[in-house]
Amino acid sequence: MKASISIDEKKDFIRWFLNKHQMKTREAMWVLNYIAGHDQIVKYVHFVDNLEGCARGLSLSAHGVESEPFLFFKGNIMTTDPEKAFHDIRLNWDEELYVELHFEEAMSSPEYALVREDNPFAAVKLADEEKEMADALIYQSVHQFSREKVLQQIDEALDTRDEAAFHKLVRILQQMDTEKE
């Protein structure tokens, strides 16, 4: 996660974006201009790659990409009506608003990279190889801990001269070692 992005950086980005890209709907441009004109709203705006898990989001598209032109959602309610979105943004200016922008070369844009944040609600997706490595590490750690615990119990059995416990624990240790192989 990067350091906090300033209000001025976000406003500069919105102005750059609107000058560089033609929105699919003029209302999308109006909403972005409205946001950029109000520092108290910009403070709560976060530009993200996806809106997964966000409580309140706005998805806007420029010409040249295959995405819905305008989507606004809050909780389980989704709308393509810019007036409803504008009304909610205006009235609930102090609520976090996550904005997803779709435009050509978005992922290679240095201007967008400057203001883009990680979505704190998105599920972390691990590759299968990473999952296998994590599982192996967990298994190895648990096995090592269990083995050390049994060795400690063997030492205690020797200290107390408990031959039955000693033989039982040695068998457990041998079984653990053969299972690991």
UniProtKB/Swiss-Prot annotation:
Gene3D superfamilies to which the protein is assigned, alphabetical: Uncharacterised family UPF0302, N-terminal domain, Virus Scaffolding Protein, Chain A
InterPro entries: IDEAL_dom, UPF0302, UPF0302_N, UPF0302_N_sf, Virus_scaffolding_prot_C
Intrachain disulfide bonds: none
Record-linked NCBIfam families: PRK03636.1 (NF002965)
Family stated for the protein in its record: Belongs to the UPF0302 family.
Protein name: UPF0302 protein lmo1921
Organism: Listeria monocytogenes serovar 1/2a (strain ATCC BAA-679 / EGD-e)
